[in-house]
């Protein structure tokens, strides 16, 4: 027993043990499973109450970003760059459009509706993202899946990120510019309460 009171459990499944080879056709392989836990304050995370600051960075990942893999170098570099710049996280940008956060999905509130990028090869469809979309629909909060450009992001009234370990995390500053009034907005608070 690990005595974990609050935190996360990470499960990773591999193709199994074999000689180094890119051939996945070997049917005799048995998948390997790695599970570990990590203590982390999730439910009473201070950032969820006061918000975080983020920057935008180029999205340098491979083309199939919708596949969850252990190849997280670009995301790690993006997060590290953000911390070195004195902020909490980064959003990954390609061709002027926001894809997602280094380990999260992104939502904005603009023109009386919530917007999040559509599922595509450019983003990993998160469990929390999916739940937030459903909760918005059930609670008659207008939500639209479409591309978000830099101008949309910078002119949004509210911005928030979602992830399995961060739930609904408000963003109060993007690229040194205050989001809305610089405080956690009413829409984000409502989504947090619903979630």
Report each predicted region and the residues it spans.
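Ordered, amphipathic secondary-structure segments that act as subunit-interaction surfaces
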Residues: 4-12
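Helix-start/capping segments and mature chain N-termini
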Residues: 1, 14, 19-195
């Amino acid at each position: 027993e690990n005595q974990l009171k609050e935190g996360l459990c990470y499960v990773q499944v591999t193709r199994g043990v074999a000689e180094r080879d890119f051939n996945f056709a070997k049917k005799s392989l048995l998948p390997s499973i790695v599970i570990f836990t990590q203590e982390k304050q999730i439910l009473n995370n201070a950032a969820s109450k006061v918000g975080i600051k983020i920057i935008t960075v180029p999205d340098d990942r491979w083309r199939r970003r919708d596949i969850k893999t252990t190849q997280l170098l670009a995301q790690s570099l993006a997060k590290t760059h953000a911390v070195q710049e004195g902020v909490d996280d980064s959003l990954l940008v390609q061709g002027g459009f926001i894809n997602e956060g280094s380990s999260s999905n992104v939502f904005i509130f603009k023109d009386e509706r919530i917007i999040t990028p559509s599922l595509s090869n450019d983003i990993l469809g998160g469990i929390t993202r999916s739940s937030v979309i459903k909760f918005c629909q059930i609670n008659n909060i207008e939500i639209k899946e479409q591309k978000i450009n830099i101008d949309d992001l910078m002119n949004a009234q509210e911005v928030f990120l979602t992830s399995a370990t961060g739930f609904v995390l408000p963003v109060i500053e993007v690229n040194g510019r205050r989001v809305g009034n610089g405080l956690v907005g009413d829409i984000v608070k409502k989504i947090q309460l619903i979630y």
